[in-house]
């Protein structure tokens, strides 16, 4: 008998909530459009497609002609639409109720627009945890696709993976297909004949096997060099022609069609996992380095093929431990979710939950070779939607809440007024973790800490050429000299932190590493008290250090669009004290070099990316997003300011990313015995 094998091609198309229109348009022109146009001309070649809900909404609005083409392909049975969480959340980190609702939302959208009831779903970043079976099944889904690494880790071999299995949780069943890592690296990078050879190797006479590639649509045109190879040089045309030429060997098929023809291979219980690269990225830098050394050792000793299934890496949720900013966003999402769920108004709840769903979009919560967490506009979008959700709720009063917000074992204080949210950390020197301007749904202090990443060691041998490689194998840089701005912070970049310097600081030294200049920096636990009346709320932090007492107050008002911050330093020793005192605020208004975004100091404008030292009683920030911030000081300070820039990886290589601006206000404070120095700073936001 003739050997044969089914082949199923799945295309996953996604854009993050908050991404720029021009970025999505470029992805459309280079990938989404030419790929569907190609398969539209090949109606006998079935494909599976997953579009995230955010991208579908964008396509429906901006390219209705594309929608019409998808409808035709669905009607003729060529396309099988695959569902997922509507806004592409990482399912394990959102509330269980939302797991089901996000999937059902996309199910309904696909049915309403294309007339299909999805049977399968795409799992965002293929992040799998065993309990998901129950919630996915409750949403009406019959199968998911995950990486073959999940299967290898429980002892299955490559020859066992050309079919599908059944998973079970509390009696709920869900089919699961393995995505071939081999095909992920062959398509569309290798000669199409190599794919045919690989499929031939595992073909069988009983016609029961299937090989699955389900991967990013962006790799067909948007990834570096792929538009040229896939379309201009004809890789895709050659690939499909090769499949058709070998029709006796290879049968293209949709996944659900295959399920109706072939029984499952058995029952399986998969561990927590994602694709192999993700499980490397989630590790801390030293652990990543050790994993790389282990992999290299196994390869050198020709043991990799045998033992690689058991070399797993980390666990996705640990991104919430690796990056405080990621954890903060996720805990804010849970906090806002709880407030929305407690609302007695169902109409308000529905509108607010739509914002929460968008605030669950996965992209800003993690980082690998894609920008992710390092992209300020993606973090900004998460905060925008979560603050908008809060704004649907009752906001006319001032209130506070004390609890362990970020689940680190220490209480935080959340203060809310009609204009602002302040997230305060007594355990981190009474600093501000988050400062929201609710009128514009904008987090003013959305700044990322400069951290060491494992890939920073690769900067020494980057190149401008990396053609023909998967983006997982490329080391390129978008500009020269990035190693010269590679600095690391020794604390999280929060605001209203205090420092005592040995002498008047040097700006360049502050920029590189302010901790080297500090005699004291106050990141330990502060005592606090809260006073509230019907018009304002005051949170006072205090501590005694080296003979002086430091007090810091935040005052929010019910009907005022400003915040007062008051510092008092009292000499409680028996000798006079002289201090080089400074306090720091870190702000991010997103556009460091745009003419509509600038500092105004005196009558001079400076880009947000600029360095400077000025004597000030006030300064302003103007932004193109319609927010103006003014800082008014009653005691003149020396203002030291510099841009906070990170070096991170994206699909196009190493890049510089503006994360915000640091503003350190410096004072020489002389304190006779028993005396107190005091200053009030008022921040107007409008």
Swiss-Prot record:
Its main location: cytoplasm. It is found in: Cytoplasm. The lineage of its organism: Bacteria, Pseudomonadati, Dictyoglomota, Dictyoglomia, Dictyoglomales. This is Alpha-amylase 1. Its EC number is 3.2.1.1. The active site is at 125 (nucleophile), 216 (proton donor). This amylase is a highly liquefying-type: oligomers appeared at the beginning of incubation, followed by a graded decrease in the amounts of maltotriose, maltose and glucose in prolonged incubation. GO terms for biological process: carbohydrate metabolic process. It holds the Pfam family Glyco_hydro_57. It comes from the Bacteria. InterPro entries: A-amylase/a-glucTrfase_C, A-amylase/a-glucTrfase_central, Gal_mutarotase_sf_dom, GH-type_carb-bd, GH57_Enzymes, Glyco_hydro/deAcase_b/a-brl, Glyco_hydro_57/38_cen_sf, Glyco_hydro_57_N. Optimum pH is 5.5. Stable above pH 5.5. The keyword Cell membrane does not apply. Optimum temperature is about 90 degrees Celsius. Highly thermostable. Retains 70% of its maximal activity after heating 1 hour at 90 degrees Celsius, but no decrease in activity was observed within the same time at 80 degrees Celsius. One of its GO terms (cellular component) is cytoplasm. It catalyses: Endohydrolysis of (1->4)-alpha-D-glucosidic linkages in polysaccharides containing three or more (1->4)-alpha-linked D-glucose units. Belongs to the glycosyl hydrolase 57 family. GO terms for molecular function: alpha-amylase activity; carbohydrate binding. It comes from Dictyoglomus thermophilum (strain ATCC 35947 / DSM 3960 / H-6-12). Keywords: Carbohydrate metabolism, Cytoplasm, Glycosidase, Hydrolase.
